[in-house]
């Protein structure tokens, strides 16, 4: 009897999605041959809700190892809206279960980040056979040491910091580089250290703008005519640490700085230190393009292991890497949790030893 396996990619795109899809497909075809059929759900959970899917062939998975983005398309379908019936009167959970049944799926593989995993867990609790795969450049999925896409994003952010050094030095400027990472600062911490940033500001460690300015002035007194500040997009200051997210976001918008902290930090540094300060936001560049060699290997490991889980009929789990071993975690154990940079993180100690200010 043929096994029918569905695959979807949900949430923001990142390097390594296609490499993971390929890893799953090649391993399934190698194990089952003609006794497996792969169904691509288009545009994430949105396609699962609307019944938008297609039958895939082996040809669909050729030449995609190095391809950025996702051949299946993706959309953000927030978990908090999954049980909300909107103006279209669609019961999203019931619709997803219907598509699963109509497509005659034996199981569904969900590639995505924290929100994707929460919905995957919901579907597993609803009785569907679900396997998750951890995708995010933020590296913040609980229960895994690394997610595919993270290392490529760090490489890109590091190159940005590298290039900013020369222009900062030439113009005697302070440069604030905004790195993706809303709730967790892993990309900023890694790229900040790799790129030689002088100040690194993370969501987990509320910064004091006076300490930031003091670090800039201290470098100037020692003869450095520029400073590099790596800022996570989710960084908050000590005042905001006592507020709800909606409250401090509203205050930022009202002040004309936008939702992230970077522009406000730059304005304060220039005002307090007198040094010309500029902002650089690489933005979606960090999510685009071909995955690094590391992420291609990791994606292939994860994809092939997911195929093994399909063979074992082990569902309600997500793939993870722990201590250099690929394992499976139960979805119910990791869904809704965030892997933040802990205070005892070795890289924070390294940064402090190097004289890097953490705000």
What are these regions (language model features)?
Residues 1-9, 20-104, 115, 237-242, ...:
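A cross-family phosphate/adenosyl-ligand binding-site feature
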Residues 14-24, 48-49, 93-94, 105-121, ...:
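Short glycine/serine/threonine-rich phosphate/pyrophosphate-binding segments
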Residues 25-58, 126-164:
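Glycine/threonine-rich beta-strand-loop-alpha-helix active-site module
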Residues 99, 110-112, 120-122, 129, ...:
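Accessory alpha-helical/coil subdomains and C-terminal extensions
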